[in-house]
C-alpha cells in the first residue's frame, strides 16, 4: 500500500481533498523533486 499511495498522491495532485495525504504531500514533494524528471512530464500531460 506504500508505493500505491505514492503514485496515487502524484496522480491525484496529492489528493488535496484528503487530510491524511497532507502529511504525505510533504514527503511526496521531496520525492517529486528527486524524480521530478518524469513527474514534471506527467504534470504537463495532466
UniProtKB/Swiss-Prot annotation:
It comes from the Bacteria. GO terms for cellular component: extracellular region. The keyword DNA repair does not apply. The precursor peptide is first ribosomally synthesized and then highly tailored by specific enzymes to yield the final natural product. These modifications include several methylations, cyclization and the formation of t-Leu and Thia-beta-Ala residues. Its main location: secreted. The keyword Oxidoreductase does not apply. Residues 10-46 form a propeptide. Keywords: Antibiotic, Antimicrobial, Secreted. NCBIfam families: bottro_RiPP (NF033414). Bottromycin D is a ribosomally synthesized and post-translationally modified peptide (RiPP) that displays antibiotic activity against methicillin-resistant S.aureus (MRSA). This is Bottromycin D. It comes from Streptomyces sp.
Amino acid at each position: 500500500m506504500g508505493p500505491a499511495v505514492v503514485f496515487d498522491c502524484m496522480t491525484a495532485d496529492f489528493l488535496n481533498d484528503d487530510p491524511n495525504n497532507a502529511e504525505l504531500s510533504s514527503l511526496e514533494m521531496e520525492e517529486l523533486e528527486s524524480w521530478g524528471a518524469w513527474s514534471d512530464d506527467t504534470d504537463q500531460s495532466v
